[in-house]
Structure formats: structure tokens, C-alpha cells
Amino acid sequence: MTSYGLTLFSALFYFCTAITTLASPSEELVHKLNAQVLRVQVELANGSYGLGSAVVIAKDQVITNCHVVAKSISIVVINNGLTLSVSAIKPDWHHDLCILKVIGLDAPIAKIGSSKNLKYEQSVFTIGYPNFIALPASTFGMVKGLYPLDNSVIIRTSSTFGLGASGGGMFDDDGNLVGVITLKSPGKEAYYYNMPVEWVQSLLNAPEQAISTKSKKPFWAASYEKWPYFMRVVQPYLTENWSSLLQIANKWAIQEPNTTEAWYYLAIAEYATNDTQKAEVHLQKVLAMNHQHSQAIYYLGLLAEKNGNHALALTDIERLESFDEATANQLKLAIELKQAQR
């Protein structure tokens, strides 16, 4: 394994172990929100069934992912053991968001917050029905990435989810709905993405359509050439294909100079290819755009240690400890590994 691989491994190890120590919202709040998240079951034309989740967003209306209900011939929502039929949909196929009309639904309505106002390292949690379970399950994490798209942001978090949770809710610590569980990247070290609630709000006044309406592919299922850059960088980053990442991130930064993550991934590619001067410049640019970008501070700490400035590296650890203890621990371990290799 390369020295960079060791650094990446230590980061992932500490990341996974530290997640369990996150502060959780009160049981009372989670229990209250559980009632707002329902199970969805669909029947397909070939006789098979599919499962998903949905959140109550208005009277007789729930939001889910379009990929949950695509190509279905019937859709039902299960609420407190009652099976209720869906009579119509309001689809936004491109953004993978579908509102389902459920006449006679008796369930509390979620309070819709804001995705655009989320901050990096803000704590969030998800509620859905993964893996065929009968009761809703919650996962807890932090906001790790915000990717501007179509007047809002795609939200990447450290809170995981499984098959069947698609369409479930992501909530902030005040219980506001701030995202819709949607997709994860392939592989063991997956990235988890949520669609923004601003798109949900835009869909509320859309016209109703029949359940049998022909479905269309969402943006994330398009050909590679049509993917947003935030999707393109994942595989080369996780597989350490730095030349590919450098090329993609450079194009991203040119086309979207106001996107923090474009400069971050460019800096990581530069760091990994030993272009440390450019990496430091671009990491500082990331922090100028977002002072709580913990991964940028993490790599600046690595650069400080690499350049023999141990005191500055310790300062970066202290800085991280003020808002992201998990990443601070990652940096501590990475520095210890570097010192052991000398």
C-alpha cells in the first residue's frame, strides 16, 4: 500500500469508528418524526414487488424517489398497519422526486426546512425503511458535501442507508425535513446522497399524473458524459486514480469556480501527485470559501507535517477538535504514521 493509501486508510478507519460517538437527537423527537415517514410498496408489470420509503409533506401527499415507483402498475403506502392506495403522482423524473397522492392519509406532516442553508459538519439524521424491516430505522451523521445544482444543493452525508430507505427523510436536529434519501455511489466505501427539499417544494404545485405515466431516467442514471462533476470524481478518488481525478477536477474548477468541492478534489489530486505547492494554494482557497471544510484542514495538517512544521500540524488538529473530533483523530493517526515511517 502506498503512503497515501495508508493515510487514506487511517482516515477511513477513524471516520468509521468515530461515527458511533455522534450526539443523537432525543428519542422523543425521533419517535415523533417516525410517524411522518411511511413505507411504500409497488407492484410491477412483471409481477414482482418493490419497496421504498416516503415522507408526509402535505395533506394526502408524500414525497419519495421516482426510481421507487417507476414502471409500477400499483402503489400503496403503509401507515400504522393500514394499506392505502396511491391515486396519482407528481413526478420530477430528472431530479428523482415524485409526490404521491394518498387520499385519506392520516399522518403528521413534516416541517420542511432548507437544504441551501445547511453547513458542513452540521449533524443530521435519516429515517427510512431499509432492508425489508417493518419499523423505521434511523442513522446519524454529518453533512460532508454540498454540491450546487439547479438552484439548490445535493447533500452528501456520513449517515448511511440501505436498500428500501430510498425516499425516506433526512432531518436536522430541530426535526426539519432537509433532504430526501436517494442514492449512494458503488463500492464498499460508498458516498451517500440526498436530494434537496427546495426541489420538493417546487413540485407541490405540479399537475397530477396517472401512475402509469411513462417514467424517465434521473440525472444520476444518465450516461457518464452527462453526470455532474460531483459524481465523476468519486471513483477515481476512491481508487486513487490521481491522473484521472486531476483531469476531472481541473475541468470542474474551471466550469464551476464557485463550487468548493471542485477546488478540494483538485487539491487532493495535486497533493497525491506531489504538486504540494498548488495543493496548498487550493486547499487555502477551499477554506476561504468554507472555513469549516474539515477535510481541507486535514490535508493542510498533512502538508504542514510533511514540510516539517509539526507545530502548525498540531494547530490544525486543535482547529478540527473545535467542530469535528473524528477528523481531528484522523489527522492525529496520519501524523503518527508519517512519523513512524521516518
Predicted feature residues:
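Conserved active-site neighborhood of the chymotrypsin/trypsin-like protease fold
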Residues: 47-49, 58-136, 151-154, 216-220, ...
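Canonical tetratricopeptide repeat
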Residues: 265, 299, 333-334
